[in-house]
Amino acid sequence: MSCGRPPPDVDGMITLKVDNLTYRTSPDSLRRVFEKYGRVGDVYIPREPHTKAPRGFAFVRFHDRRDAQDAEAAMDGAELDGRELRVQVARYGRRDLPRSRQGEPRGRSRGGGYGRRSRSYGRRSRSPRRRHRSRSRGPSCSRSRSRSRYRGSRYSRSPYSRSPYSRSRYSRSPYSRSRYRESRYGGSHYSSSGYSNSRYSRYHSSRSHSKSGSSTSSRSASTSKSSSARRSKSSSVSRSRSRSRSSSMTRSPPRVSKRKSKSRSRSKRPPKSPEEEGQMSS
């Protein structure tokens, strides 16, 4: 029987399924091997619908059940074309098909029918996928729920806090970030055991002192720079003024006051005689 079309009538035959075939194995070679054990009614090798390549298994049908059992016992584990065959009796019978589809070529089932194998495997393959999808969706939902519970009920009682450290479990105010450190390391929980003066409080105090020292040093540097600039400006102004005064003194001759000239003229007169003095007194 050729492998391209189904047999005309397979009712009442015993079907053996032969697995682990090579692509080179033909229906004629299988018929020659299995005819040693009895009358063979049909040999069928399913092929892929698109590529027409063999699918790696075949169905061999016997008219007598004893012949089928003898062939199964002898050929199960035998080698053919370099492959070890696996032979077993098909468990499922042929499925009744409508009259309009009886002439169409279909894949055989394990029990001698054409078309039940592909449908049954399709149904079996679909159900695990659906289960797998439902299982994969389950953990994601549970994760999202667990995350929402973790964020909502346990930590975030205040609506504005985003980080879990600044929430109601660690700090009472929703906006303070530094209070987490104070409440955790220098609060009432650690004050009895002496953690308030530990390295954490020292670290934060040294950090605040360094910040304040840097700010004061920057301010003093800025004030010293401004005072030095003012001093340089005042010194330059005083120098310019002294230079202008010295230049004006060198250009203009010294002025003599009128009082000094009158006193000089009076002192230059000759002394009066005693006669003139007597006249002046009379």
Swiss-Prot record:
Keyword annotations of the record: Acetylation, mRNA processing, mRNA splicing, Nucleus, Phosphoprotein, RNA-binding
GO biological processes: mRNA processing; regulation of alternative mRNA splicing, via spliceosome; RNA splicing
Comp. bias intervals (Basic and acidic residues): 93-107
Annotated RRM domain residues: 14-92
Gene Ontology molecular function terms on file: RNA binding
Modified residues (Phosphoserine): S2, S26, S156, S158, S171, S173, S196, S273
Compositional bias (Basic residues): 116-136, 144-154, 201-210, 256-271
Expression (tissue specificity): Strongly expressed in pancreas, spleen and prostate. Weakly expressed in lung, liver and thymus.
Biased composition (Low complexity): 155-177, 185-200, 211-227, 234-255
GO cellular component: cytosol; nuclear speck; nucleoplasm
Region of interest: Disordered: 91-282
Keyword Acetylation: yes
One Pfam family hit: RRM_1
Matching InterPro entries: Nucleotide-bd_a/b_plait_sf, RBD_domain_sf, RBM, RRM_dom
Keyword Repeat tagged: no
Function: Involved in pre-mRNA alternative splicing.
PANTHER family xref list: TRANSFORMER-2 SEX-DETERMINING PROTEIN-RELATED (PTHR48034)
Family: Belongs to the splicing factor SR family.
Protein name per Swiss-Prot or TrEMBL: Serine/arginine-rich splicing factor 8
Organismal lineage: Eukaryota, Metazoa, Chordata, Craniata, Vertebrata
Recorded name of the encoding gene: SRSF8
